[in-house]
């Protein structure tokens, strides 16, 4: 294949070779990044030269990176050793689906969607009690969508994109889903009850702290107040979506047809 399109970094790419004619395009699997990864990952020992060489062989397999903001350009440069001339400010094809918003039947209660980040360093599952939440926030119905690997707790079976479109309020923590929801002008509340621990274990970048100066709760009482207030944080969307025009797929196709 002359063109290889990927949406994350695959370790196996470091062990194979490509021809000079082949081009690899990174479309990325998320609307942005709030967690540190790649060369900025807290678990990586930068003094381990062979390990870093192995990682770089994976990262350097990519020729182009699609971004929807200058922030993600900066993230790819720092995290994956991308070069400025490899950045394509086309927006992300995965976000084109939101060009035509779907209409959903009005319900008696507005939907509050809770989407917690998967924590791979603990078996503890922190959920929000639905009955208590709906008592404290009587205008809302709480729906919880957990990571697919978590099967010990109830999780709404509907598609996450459908739920995001249906919801009035998105409650999350360190997930890039907040960036995706901001594109739809949703109210986003960060329920970051274990922020210090998560930062210690996984690493949160500066952009997380910048965009969570508003609408952040460390406890349930504050969360209830923010839900009832229902105030949109208008800073998130311009941070991450300066190149999002819902035409990224067409731009990518045109780029490939011109010879990539």
Predicted segment positions?
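Active-site regions of enzymes building and remodeling cell-envelope glycoconjugates
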Residues: 19-25, 141-142, 150-161, 214
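Donor nucleotide-activated moiety binding/catalytic core segment of transferases
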Residues: 1, 148-179, 183-184, 195
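Active-site and donor-binding regions of nucleotide-sugar-utilizing enzymes
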Residues: 1-99
């Amino acid at each position: 294949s002359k063109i290889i399109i990927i949406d994350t970094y695959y370790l196996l790419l470091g062990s194979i070779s490509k021809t000079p004619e082949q081009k690899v395009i990174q479309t990325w699997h998320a609307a942005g990044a709030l967690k540190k990864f790649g060369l900025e990952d807290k678990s990586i020992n930068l003094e381990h030269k062979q390990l870093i060489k192995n990682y770089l062989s994976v990262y350097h397999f990519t020729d182009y990176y699609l971004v929807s903001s200058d922030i993600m350009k900066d993230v790819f440069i720092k995290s994956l050793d991308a070069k400025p001339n490899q950045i394509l400010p086309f927006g992300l094809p995965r976000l084109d689906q939101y060009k035509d918003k779907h209409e959903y039947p009005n319900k008696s209660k507005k939907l509050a969607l809770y989407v917690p980040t998967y924590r791979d360093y603990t078996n503890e599952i922190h959920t929000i009690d639905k009955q208590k939440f709906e008592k404290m926030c009587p205008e809302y119905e709480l729906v919880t969508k957990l990571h697919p690997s978590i099967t010990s707790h109830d999780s709404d079976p509907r598609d996450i994109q459908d739920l995001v479109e249906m919801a009035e309020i998105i409650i999350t923590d360190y997930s890039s889903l907040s960036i995706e929801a901001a594109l739809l002008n949703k109210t986003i509340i960060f329920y970051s009850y274990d922020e210090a621990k998560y930062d210690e274990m996984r690493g949160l970048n500066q952009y997380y702290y910048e965009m969570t100066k508003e609408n952040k709760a460390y406890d349930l009482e504050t969360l209830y107040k923010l839900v009832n207030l229902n105030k949109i944080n208008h800073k998130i969307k311009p941070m991450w979506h300066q190149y999002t025009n819902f035409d990224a797929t067409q731009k990518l196709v045109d780029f490939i047809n011109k010879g990539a």
